[in-house]
Amino acid sequence: MSVSENILENASRVFGELRRQAWQKPAARPAHKPANPCQDLAGRHLGNPVAMRADFNMAVSAHRNVVSEFHNCWARRIFAILGAAALCACSAMKLGYQQGDHLAYWWIDNYVDVSTAQEPLTREAIARFFAWHRKAQLPEIASLLQQAKADVRQPVTPATVEHFQDASQQLARKSFEQAMPDLADLLLTLTPEQIGRMEKRFAEGNAKYRKKFLNPDPAEREDARYDKVMDYARLVYGSFSSDQEKAIRARMGPVVQNAEARYAERVARQQEWLRMVRYVHATQPPKAQVMDVLRRFREYWQNPPAKHAASHEASINAGIALTVAIANMTTPQQKAHAQDRFQKWIDDTHALIREKANAPVQSAATN
């Protein structure tokens, strides 16, 4: 699976929220419920645990945001924060990570309206995940960024892109396993009202997705996808010439043509997630069984069923081809810009590793 399109779509708004959090106090809210500055983001698919779908892979250029494809109700939001921060500015990566626990909680609350009883356990789970991730995965991320910095000066091949895909998939799987016990605990406590709220958020996000990416006007549809691709490309390589932009647009066809199939796969994942959540609510199985169900869902989104497999593979291949084309048309100056960008991300990652290096890491597996 390639870079999550929802991360890029919302990166500027997320970064705006990060800056607002850094400099402003939230509006007063009732004492029993924390302020939620992310409510205006309700319904968008950034926080959707099953809406993630990609059609463009800037694996070498943006390093896939390393873990931006991760799907679940806690860790996925954390990675969304990281991905959005990385897309906006180098220093924002640190800011996003440092405030990620708060934003992750707000996203979860936006989807399920966390109850008073659920709140302390949810916050503890998020803190536990961040402590683990800082120790276990940030060093791996720094290493992969270092590889990307070296590779970006060389001719890029599909194999290069696939290497970063595989590496980020492995990070995602490890993260899912780490968060799974806490996620199982949350699923066992969800009420019918919370599940209904989640379904409503999916529907709202899908409506926004259709409006932007499934516009009846082919030109509008292409423009929306092109803008997304160029946001990634400019972030990493800097500005592009008009000739380069025309060449990139000319290669957009396979990416745009698969839009309907991608949307169908997106909706199917959402429905599979909702079926799983309702099953857990109705049967209240032992925690170990809930974790087994979560693993099956993970396999579903990493290896979609046959009816979606062809479009899934086509999207991946289209993204790889476009990534390779963009990387190989860049000038020495653009490649130097990319190396500088990666180095700043590397520096920020190392700084984050040093922060709270001795933070305790606990597990919820036996809770």
Q: Residue locations for each model-derived region?
A:
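C-terminal motif of bacterial Sec signal peptides marking the signal peptidase cleavage site
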Residues: 88-89
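N-terminal Sec/ER secretory leader and immediately downstream segment
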Residues: 93-193, 197, 201, 342-345
